[in-house]
C-alpha cells in the first residue's frame, strides 16, 4: 500500500533491510515484523503522534497509548476528561522510546537493537491495535514478509 504518486524508494529499502534482518540470528522474526509494519505506516504518513502528548503537548511521562486517537498521552492527561482512562493503555517508557525510534530512524539503522520480552509484548499490542483502528488495507509486502516468517 502506497499513496498515489509517492516515491516508493524508502519502502523498497525498508523491505530490503527487513529481509536482510531476517538472516540475523540475534534478531527475533517477531521484532523484524513489528519494526517493518510500524515503519511502513510511518513512511506512508500515517504514524501515530508519539513525541508529545496528544492532549497537552507535554514531551515527558508519555506512558499511555491511545489507538483510537492515534497518539500518546502523558500521565496527567490520561486521568482527565475526556480520556479518564478510557481507550488508552499503559506502555513502558522503553516501549515509547522504541516506537519513537522506529518512526524517526533512517531505514538503514532500524535493525540495530533488540528488546526485552515485555517491550516486545507491548510493541505487538500497539502495532496490532493501531493497524486495526487506522489501516484499512492489507500491505502486500507485509503479506510477503508474513509468508517468509512461516519458514
Language model features by range: what are they?
Residues 1-151:
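Non-catalytic alpha-helical scaffolds and adjoining flexible linkers that form interface surfaces
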Amino acid at each position: 500500500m502506497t499513496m498515489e504518486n509517492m516515491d516508493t524508494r524508502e519502502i523498497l529499502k525498508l523491505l530490503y533491510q527487513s529481509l536482510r534482518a531476517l538472516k540475523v540470528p540475534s534478531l527475533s522474526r517477531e521484532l523484524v515484523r513489528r519494526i517493518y509494519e510500524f515503519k511502513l505506516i510511518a513512511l506512508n504518513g500515517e504514524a501515530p503522534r508519539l513525541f508529545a502528548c496528544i492532549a497537552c503537548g507535554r514531551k515527558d511521562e508519555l506512558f499511555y497509548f491511545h489507538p483510537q486517537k492515534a497518539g500518546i498521552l502523558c500521565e496527567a492527561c490520561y486521568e482527565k476528561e475526556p480520556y479518564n482512562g478510557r481507550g488508552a493503555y499503559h506502555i513502558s517508557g522503553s516501549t515509547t522510546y522504541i516506537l519513537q525510534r522506529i518512526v524517526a530512524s533512517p531505514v538503514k539503522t532500524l535493525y540495530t537493537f533488540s528488546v526485552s520480552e515485555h517491550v516486545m509484548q507491548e510493541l505487538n499490542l500497539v502495532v496490532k491495535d493501531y493497524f486495526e483502528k487506522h489501516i484499512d488495507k492489507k500491505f502486500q509486502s507485509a503479506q510477503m514478509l508474513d509468508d517468509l516468517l512461516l519458514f
